[in-house]
């Protein structure tokens, strides 16, 4: 499932998925969060956890975070999460800022699209066992548009979030 929203690669719509994740964590479920955008901050979960009166420490033990600092690291994390899912029995897998990695100009376009297709096939396979949410934002370039086009056959659903008072959210 692609969840697209305002902000750089869906930065603002991430709050929605964080809320879903906190709810699952507070109920004793595990969550995998793969960060491809170098922006994951677990402290953003704390206010919602406190409001649900759940133990932050206990909840964070069930939050499995993977950070890919390069495209190849992100690819390895996505491939590996299938094996981890068998152990953790996670209720959701979040891939945050994935397409940002594929826009790196140092990666050849053919290689980039090939890795993207492999990642998407792996995630599509994972989605048979557990919901997979890919976060992204509005298209930023022609290459970004091409990458989204490559994603379409692999997506079961595509949701777009939009804030009513966009100017006030800045």
Language-model-derived ranges and their functions:
Residues 2-6, 64-67, 108-109:
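Short, basic, glycine/proline-bearing loop/turn elements
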Residues 34-105:
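Conserved inter-motif catalytic segment of the P-loop NTP-binding fold
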Residues 107-115:
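Alpha-helix N-cap and loop-to-helix initiation/capping positions
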Residues 124-170:
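Phosphate-binding/switch region of NTP-binding enzymes
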Residues 20-23, 115-129:
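Catalytic-core regions built around general acid/base machinery
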Residues 2, 92-96, 133:
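Structural motif
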Residues 1-35:
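Glycine-rich P-loop/Walker A and Walker A-like loops and their local beta1-loop-alpha1 context
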